[in-house]
Amino acid sequence: MHFNEHTRFAMDIAQEAATELLRRFHDHHDVRSKSTPNDLVTEADEFSEKLLVARIRRRFPTHGILTEEGTSQSSLASEWLWLLDPLDGTVNYAHGLPSFSVSIALVHEGEVVCGVVCSPCQDLLFVAERGQGAWQDGKRLHVSAAPSLSEAMLSTGFPYRMVGNPENNLREFAAVALRAQAVRRLGVASLDLAWVAAGVLDGYWEANLQPWDWAAGALLVEEAGGKVTDYDGRRWTVETTRLVATNGLYHDELLAVLRGA
């Protein structure tokens, strides 16, 4: 597959950052809390973010950049905007659990045009370019054929602040778990979506999201033939905070369960 300049660049820098994260994985980490005690940041997050931002500013100096750790906070209205999660799965990483990723998306005039998710521990690179399909290491991806929620394995996530949060996902989790074949919690939103695109997971839902959490993965799912909306069934935008992604075959069924929870 021949990708355009932006996508090839995103692939290169994602792999560079992933290599550095993997090299530091078994080191002792300086772990700090951000908004809550379970909202963590490590020196690896910050190193990866600074590396990615520096590479983008050198190559595309006029582009905006929006990052999880705050190194760069451009407006969502920027004509060209890079959305970066330099270490998706920080809690996993800090505990030595080998499930984390680097997630990069490029937005042009409000539309995500390329997305890259790199899983260093599994040596996997997921890539999507709008109109060109979703790919994993040269293999074209397609969502699963699970026809109904009862035959689907899904993944979800939970917010950092659970107590007193009406969107803590506990009601929704219980409602879906009683109807689905299985529900998993991997702790890495970008990889959840990549696995939906690959047909390994059949669906994913989560609230309290930021655009860098899901933008690359959402494009992967769409380009793999799946469906991505908000909880109300509207097509996603970079301002969406509650996301549902499926193979498209039982999407309305899942939305109905979430609404009824």
Spans of features found by a protein language model:
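N-terminal subdomain of lithium-sensitive/metallo-dependent phosphomonoesterases centered on the IMPase/IPPase/PAP
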Residues: M1-L87, L249, A256
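Residue-level signal for inorganic ion chemistry
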Residues: L21-R24, D45, I56, T90, ...
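A short, compositionally biased
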Residues: D27, F100, A128-Q132, E222, ...
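Short secondary-structure boundary/capping segments
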Residues: R32, R57, S72-S75, V117, ...
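Generic detector of well-ordered alpha-helical packing
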Residues: E46, K50, E69, P86-G89, ...
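DPxDG-like acidic metal-binding loop motif
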Residues: L76-W135
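An extended, acidic
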Residues: H142-A261
